[in-house]
Amino acid sequence: MGEKITFKSYREMPLCAMSIADMTYNLTGSWRNVRPYYDFKVSPCRLGCPTAENIQRYIFLVTEGDYEQAWKAIIESNPMPSITGRVCFHPCMEKCTRKDFDQAINIPAIERSLGDMGLDNPKWMNKAKATHKEKIAVIGSGPAGLSCAFYLAQQGYPVTMFEADSALGGTLRWGIPEYRLPNNAVDRVIASILESGPITVKTGAVLGKDITLDKLEKEYAAVFIGVGLTKSRPMGIAGEEGQGVERGLEFLRKVNRGEKVNPGKSVVVVGGGNTAMDVARCARRSGSDVTVVYRRTMNEMPAIKDEIEEAEREGVQLHFLAAPTSIARSGKGPIKVTFQQMKLGAPDESGRRRPVPDGDKTFTMEVDTMFTAIGEEGDASPFEQVIDVDGKLIKTRSESGETSKPKIFAGGDIVTGAASVVEAVSAGRKAAERIGRLLTGASEPAAEEPRTISIENINTAYFTKTKRVLVPRIGAGEALKGHREIYTGFDDELLHREADRCFSCGVCNFCDNCWVFCPDVAVNRLADKYEFNLDYCKGCLVCVTECPRSAISTLEEGK
């Protein structure tokens, strides 16, 4: 091999055919018959979220280290991420595109981390002042009422909250055990909401006694009802009332109040929802042997899957296809509960197969306590003289919670029946937004059909398969010693590791692929976005192919 020759300048090079001019004179854009354009879609996770949180946005901001703006992105649609990050049934994860590649992003864990950061940094919260003279009344201080009050206050409306209990929170305080949702977290969220704007509170305000709907309607510009469901549904069987049988909701209320409970050595819980799981796990913490009896199978259980798995991990036994028919007592000792064996028949209105008796097959369980947790009921009687009701629920005319009276709105479980915390939060926000438009005369926002993507639109060549980062937790043995919170939350390293897994579906996250790969140098990289230089883009669509997240679409030239 010959000696290496180094040229200090092109002038030292021997004569050869070469070009030292640029090609800007050649407007290759004239060759184009299709043009690319940046086209941001709605990520599937956001479409799955009942509060429509901009999940892609706040996870991207986490990867950038901008926690304050990430928290503010959540607060736009959900004022209590510290709570929903702990107790939501996270349908967003079911929609997460990454689950079709490896495992869904742990969205609730990221949401919880940001929610806790927001509580630790109260200066992040916008402190709204009263800018409107119209006063709004909110009845109930559960998730729907708190959400409605927050978003009304953020618009500048003075809000008065009426709560029958001695403390705010509703189901957040009394219906969810501390090992899932610590009282301290509830207290901090409520304090944050009350400090966010012109909100005053009146506790011990009992409907029909201290306040009435017709009076509030006269005194306030608008009223929102978010009282939730307050009663356990009865089973309607012989012996249901009496010693040895207790409503699940009442038991949870005692536990959350810190009262001493002793359900006995053997306990059966009837039901398959989250309340049943909560009651069973609280009873285990009292030292009881617990069996949950459900009339359908595991597949039909309405409880959050994670809660079922946690209950089993803590030693709760599950017995399926059985329903209680009678309860017998002899003195003050254990009770005998007779169960009918069931089988699944045709689907009912919920889409689940209806349980029907399996002939004459029965069995008996002898237990110290039976807890009933077959659902909750509302009480619409305080409102039926003023607005239309539907049995034990309030009738509404839209997702915004409008009732038969134009100034009265309702939302949450008192409208839908038993649902979730996050759905109640969404109902409260939508009602607040509608009330604001009603009082200002603003028009309704135009409805747009959201465009989204699926795994087929993701260029997975740019991603490595990784496992979801799990939230650290205490062991089952340690958990049963008390009501300490089970999941301890992400630290900064785990938070970033999980956020970095996000595909950022349909939304540019400035990865530079289009800028790097464009053969015509027709992508201009600006401070906060990219632009196509259509004088030189010849429509080769390399940018579309190499975009990892389908944030670029195409349009036929001339259209």
Residue map of PLM features:
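Glycine-rich Rossmann-fold phosphate-binding loop(s) that bind the pyrophosphate
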Residues: 139-143, 271-273, 413
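Short internal alpha-helix immediately C-terminal to a glycine-rich phosphate-binding loop
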Residues: 114-128, 249-262, 267
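Residues that mark the start of a beta-strand
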Residues: 135, 158, 265-266, 407
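Rossmann-like dinucleotide-binding core of oxidoreductases
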Residues: 232-241, 259-321, 326, 415-455
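Generic enzyme active-site microenvironment
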Residues: 161, 410-411
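Ferredoxin-type iron-sulfur electron-transfer modules and their immediate structural context
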Residues: 1-135, 183, 225-241, 329-334, ...
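Beta1-alpha1 glycine-rich phosphate/pyrophosphate-binding loop at the start
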Residues: 11, 18-22, 26, 52-63, ...
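A Rossmann-like FAD-binding core segment of flavoenzymes
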Residues: 184-234, 246-263, 285-391
